[in-house]
Structure formats: C-alpha cells, structure tokens
Regions:
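Extended effector regions of multi-domain proteins
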Residues: 2-12, 99-104, 108-117, 140-141, ...
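Exposed beta-strand-loop-beta-strand "reactive/processing" segments of non-cytosolic proteins
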Residues: 45-99, 147-199, 262, 396
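Hydrophobic or amphipathic alpha-helical targeting/insertion segments
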Residues: 89-90, 95-123, 127, 131
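Short, non-transmembrane alpha-helical segments in secretory-pathway proteins
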Residues: 23-67, 118-158
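Terminal targeting/leader modules
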Residues: 2-27, 33-48, 63-70, 78-81, ...
Length: 705
C-alpha cells in the first residue's frame, strides 16, 4: 500500500534561483544546485541524499497562455520534482519546489515504494560483493579461485519484484560474470548464481543458487576488441571512407533549445527518465503556424525474458522507470555516433549530494540525406520530362546504455511533414550459463559454447499528446474494410470494393485496441473541427506502426501486472498535467498489485476522450529470439514508426523543395538532348568505375538526359 505521511509544506527563503531561457528547458546545473540548496536549507536535520532533481513540467494551460503572448503573460514558475532518500528511513521523500520563489511547495514521505536506481547505486554492487564470503564461496564452486575475485563482475539489476523480499528494502540482483582478463567481454562467461544486494545496507541478503550447477565456461572469451578481431583474421581492408560534406553548414536554426527546420519548430527537452522530450511541435504552413503535438516522449519500456526457471522470471527490466533513459545516456562523439555537421546539447543531473553532473553532448542534432523525396518521369518522351527532389532529414538523437544493451533513439523529421521515431538496439545480449548437452527448452538459444541467451521482448511505451490544429482532438482507428455488398450486387458487382473504415473513440474503453496487420490498422489523431476542403476529412496525423508484438507473459503474470501499459497497442486517456509514467512513478519493486500507471488512469474506462485534450499511449517494439549472429556484440537492429500528416496539408507540402532535376515536356523539346540545370547539380557525385571524363559524367548524371 502506498502510504502518504504529510509533512512540512511551504518553507520559504529569498530566491537566488538562476533564470531559465524557456519554461520547458531542463534544469541547468545551476538550477540543480539551487534546488538542492533549498531542500538542504529547509531540512537541515535530515540526512538526505538526492535521487531525482528534475523539472516539473509547467502546467499546460499556463504554458500555452505564456507561449501565445509571452510579452503579456507571466512565465510559468519553475517547479522542481525532488525525490530524496533519508538514511535509515524506508520510502522516499517526494518534494515539489518553486524554484522561482525559492520555496518548498510540498515535501512528503511516500512509503511502500522504491525510487529509480542511479548509476551511483548500480556501481556499488560489484565493488562490494567481491569481498562477501558467501559470494566468494559460490565463485569457488563455479571454478573460480578465491584469489581471482577481481575477475568477477556483475551487471546489477533492480530485483524487479520477488515476493520473498517485497518492497521494503531497496534491492538489486547481481547478474554474475567472469573475465579472465580485464579486457574480456564478460558475457561469454556468465555464472549460474545470483546474489541479492541491499542497496542501502550494502549487504548480500540472499543468493539464488540453481539446482543444476553450471561451472564457469572453460571456452575462450568471445571478445570484440581489436586483438580478438586480429586473431580472427583482422579488420577488413576494403571499406573506403564515406565523408559527409555540408559546405554551407546546416539548414536548421537553434535558439536555446528551440529548433527551427523546414517549417517545423519545436523545443527539445530532456530528463533523467524519458531522455529526449519533444515539446510544442508546430508547422509553419505558408505563414500559418499550426500546432501539431504538445509533447512526445518515450515514457516507459519493459524487457520481459521468457525463461520460466526461477530466478529468470525476475528479468523484466523497465529500463526507463527503473534506471532512466536520461541517467544512462551516453556522451556522444563527433564523427562517430553522428556524422556530418552536428549541434550538441548537454544534459545535467544531480549526484547523490545534489551537486550537478554534466553529460557533455548528450543530444545530437544533425541532418542526413533522406533519399528521393519524390520523382516522376514521363515515358512518352523517353523519360525526358521529369522531376526529382531529394530530401534531407533532421535527426535528434541520444544513445543510452542499459547495462548490457544500447538503445539508440532517433527522432527524425522529414520534409513532407512526417515525424519518425527509429530505435536501434545494439550492445550485448543478456546471457546465462548452460552446460554442454543441456537442453535449452526452447526458451533461449545457445549463442556460444556454454552460453544461452534467453528469448525476450523490448516493448516501448510512446506517449503522444497531440495538438492537431489545437488542443481539442479525437482519435480514430482506421481499418481497411471490404464492402459488405456481395459480388454481383449493384453496390459491389465485381466484388473489389474496399475502403478505410474509421472508428472514432468516444471513451477510454473504446480506445483499448491492438494492431491488426490484415487490415493495415492505423490510428489517426484528428481535429474533428478542421475539415479538409478537398477530401472532406478531418486534419490528422496518422500513427503508422507495424512492429507491435503482443506482450507474451500471460494475463495474471508478474510482468502483465507490473507492465499494464504493454497489454495493448493503443490506450488513450484524457490529458492530465504531469501524468507521465505508464507503469507508475516509482517502478522498482512494484508487485503489480495493483497495477500502477495506465491501468489506474483508465479506471472504469468511461472517461470521455472525444474532441478533447487526449494522450495516446502506444506500445511497440520487438520480440527477440537471439541468434549467434547477435553475439558477442549485436549488429544494430532497427524498428521504426511514423506520424504522418493526412488531410492536414492542402497538397504535398514538400512541392517547394528545390528539385535536383526538373524538366517539362516543352522544355525538353526545345533544349534537345543534353540539358544541365546548373544551379541544382550535385557536383560531388561521380561514377565509381570506368570513364571519368566530364562528358561521360554528364551523361550519367541525373541532371542531364
Ligand atoms: N537492462 C537492465 C539494466 C538496465 C540498466 C542498468 C542495469 C540493468
Ligand atoms: Cu533483445
């Protein structure tokens, strides 16, 4: 039970708060410091450590009022979410500060919950367990000598939930490995036991030991460092460099954290949990600035593993809610994580003492070639009449490391008004020990001698607060449907009639829906009051998403209960300020009884979601049956979804993108065989082989016929 003990509210001091550029900006390092100082001054007698000091998003109505008339409206107050721990006290201190006023608005102890694990919390486990006698004993049983404990490593995971230990203590499970050399990849040498670690007392409180023992593998480590590749024959020598050139720099403008690019304008937020947050996205449609989305972010994810043997049921990481997509974010390297001309944004987080830590280059913003945007040629004059425009895309990205896995998150803006989310998975499989000849049971794949990688899913929750031409929107599900009229009937004589069947959701219950590939199902975020003059249909952005596996853990299972958001592809709820976390605010060690987050907000499902401010929660991802090709390090596996304008623009909004080649029929007749449209020519592309004379190049160029 979540028990709230109301404590002190409203402690005031003179404000010395630094001023932010924009109400949606994440807290700066100076603001984090100032927020920590307010808390420390208010509660000098408490021995507090900080878990979260993060912007509490402004209330939407206040933000929109300010944004519509910034000169006339006061800036929304900077409010700050605090999660702090007090030594020896179970539960978390949850605070809300008004940073502008230098004031504590609320500070209360929430019991029966556990906060996110920070990198600091994770780092303790390995350091401590190496000298714990019961762990050393298990290592020796596994075939590692007691004086080799510096070669023993662990990936610390939150325990998830284990009914033996409940939620009282802050627990981590140590997923154990061995390296014969510090440069080894430990994942080819998993150990078969799992210590349970108390994060606060630094004690190992239990060790899960399997009935069948699996000594540490005697195989060579499966490494991916240069020496290992050398032993396999060395790096390939036939890869020629590809250099990205942007001689005139970038096509986007940056003002603070606001980006303008190709008619789009948006604010790039970032927080410890969701990582990148895209705020207040608008599109300048020939002078009319049209709102598209108020806020889009990755709100949660769950990675359930499919091996039924204890304790593997505990492997179902909520990487955002339990560890934080911001806290785990990488500092990105120029020419490496992103190529071309890059603009970076840093991220600032608190350490346990409330001192700011800055992650340099946490967000990468850059452009890439986007292939052909549109093309048509007329066969009548041997394709001389032709147009071809190439696209450019804007990419806002981050990469976070969730212990073994890397998640690469790309928010991509296209010139036709489409917004895409692409996530690529790389890094290393979570592995476990398997004896020679031992059956996998089908629940995993032997990816290397002595190594099994269990089946699992990566299910993400995308939170979309649409604002299609205004705050009042509806959601409709669209299915390809065939005419009900039989073949031979007047209405469908040839039997070929089909059409898009749109179902507008009225209530929260209506909107609980799953993907249906056979009907090309999609979901439109519509403004029912904005009707397109040609199509007669409402202005919309369509969610096109096909990688939508169902949650495989069964109804009633621990994962099903804890990850309520993942039970369906789409949920829609009425908008509520600061309702961000679909598996609950405090995810570690929730039992799922009751299911937190979305299931609570759904309630009896009768809430109105028609023609109002709504939030669409979309579950997407993939089911991963590991293969040896995923090991020892996984080639990046992409998944992608689109938000596409439909009945929103009068016509193709990218018609004004300068084409690489354009020729009319009359122009082709007049100019004859060889035409170069000088100003648009790509001067860098050239033939790979053979003739390189100027004439030959011109003949094969897209700019000549
Ligand atoms: N994938 C589970 C996890 C994530 C981050 C840190 C530790 C473990
Ligand atoms: Cu995977």
């Amino acid at each position: 039970m979540l028990e709230r003990l109301s404590q002190i509210t409203s402690h005031t001091r003179a404000s010395t708060a630094p001023v932010a550029d924009h109400p949606l900006d994440p807290l700066s390092a100076a603001e984090i410091k100032a927020a920590a100082a307010i808390v420390k001054a208010a509660y000098p007698d408490k021995n507090l450590t900080f878990n979260v000091i993060s912007l509490a998003d402004p209330r939407k109505s206040e933000f929109l009022a300010w944004s519509a008339a910034p000169e006339k409206t006061s800036v929304p107050a900077r409010e700050v979410d605090i999660v702090a721990l007090e030594a020896g006290v179970s539960g978390v201190w949850e605070g809300l500060l008004d940073l502008t006023a230098g004031k504590v608005l609320s500070f209360e102890l929430v019991t029966g919950v556990q906060p996110i694990l920070t990198i600091d919390d994770l780092s303790k486990v390995e350091r401590v367990i190496r000298s714990v006698p019961s762990v050393i004993e298990q290592c020796v049983i596994s075939g590692i000598s007691a004086d080799e404990m510096d070669k023993v490593y662990c990936d610390p995971w939150t325990i998830g939930y284990d009914e033996r230990f409940g939620t009282e203590r802050r627990l981590q499970q140590a997923i154990m490995y061995y390296r014969s050399d510090e440069d080894d990849s430990q994942y080819s040498h998993p150990l078969d036991f799992c210590p349970i670690f108390d994060t606060e007392t630094l004690e190992v409180i239990a060790i899960d030991i399997p009935n069948v023992r699996r000594p540490v593998s005697k195989a060579k480590h499966a490494n991916f460092h240069a020496k290992a590749v050398e032993e396999l024959g060395g790096y390939r020598t036939d890869v020629k460099p590809i250099i990205v050139q942007q001689p005139e720099g970038v096509s986007f403008k940056v003002s603070g954290r606001e980006i303008e690019w190709q008619n789009f304008k948006l604010h790039v937020g970032f927080n410890y949990r969701e990582g990148i947050v895209l705020n207040n996205i608008t599109y300048n449609d020939h002078g009319e600035v049209r709102p598209l989305f108020y806020r889009i972010s990755l709100a949660e994810m769950v990675v359930p593993y499919g091996c039924p043997d204890h304790p593997h049921q505990r492997k179902h990481a909520f990487d955002l809610g339990e560890y934080g997509g911001g806290y785990m974010t990488n500092s990105l390297a120029l020419g490496c994580d992103c190529k071309g001309v890059i603009h970076y944004m840093d991220a600032a987080f608190p350490d346990r003492n409330g001192e700011p830590i800055t992650v340099k280059n946490a967000i990468c913003i850059h452009e890439e070639d986007d292939g052909v945007l549109f093309k048509h040629s007329d066969f009548r004059d041997n394709y001389a009449t032709s147009v071809l425009a190439r696209g450019v895309k804007l990419i806002i990205s981050q990469i976070f490391t969730a212990a073994n896995y890397e998640y690469m998150v790309y928010w991509i803006f296209h010139m036709d008004g489409t917004i895409q989310l692409e996530i690529k998975l790389t890094g290393i499989l979570n592995t476990y020990a398997i004896n020679d000849g031992e059956e996998t049971g089908g629940f995993g794949t032997r990816v290397y001698p002595g190594v099994i990688a269990h089946n699992h899913q990566h299910l993400f929750s995308l939170r979309i607060n649409p604002m299609i031409d205004g705050v009042e929107n509806s959601i409709q599900m669209v299915d390809a449907a065939v005419s009900a009229a039989p073949v031979g009937s007047k209405e469908n004589f040839y039997g070929n009639a089909f059409f898009p069947k749109a179902t507008v959701f009225k209530t929260v219950n209506d909107a609980i829906t799953d993907y249906e590939g056979a009907t090309s199902r999609s979901w439109d975020m519509i403004n029912p009051k904005k009707i397109h003059p040609y199509s007669g249909k409402p202005a919309s952005y369509k969610l096109v998403s096909h990688e939508t596996p169902l949650l495989l853990p069964k109804e009633g299972s621990l994962v099903w209960k804890r990850a309520g958001f993942a039970r369906h592809t789409v949920h829609v709820t009425p908008y509520v300020d600061r309702q961000f976390y679909p598996a609950g605010k405090y995810v570690p060690q929730t039992s799922g009884e009751p299911s937190r987050g979305l299931p609570e907000w759904i309630g009896d499902g009768t809430g109105n979601i028609e023609n109002t401010d709504v939030v669409l929660w979309h579950t997407f991802g993939l089911t991963h049956f590991p293969a040896p090709e995923d090991f020892p390090i996984m080639p990046a596996e992409p998944m992608s979804l689109l938000l596409r304008p439909r009945n929103f623009f009068l016509q193709n909004p990218a018609l004004d993108v300068p084409p690489s080649y354009i020729m009319t029929t009359s122009g082709a007749k007049k100019l004859g065989e060889s035409v170069v449209v000088e100003s648009l020519t790509d001067k860098v592309s050239r033939l790979a082989f053979g003739e390189t004379s100027a004439e030959k190049l011109a003949e094969s160029s897209c700019c000549s016929k």
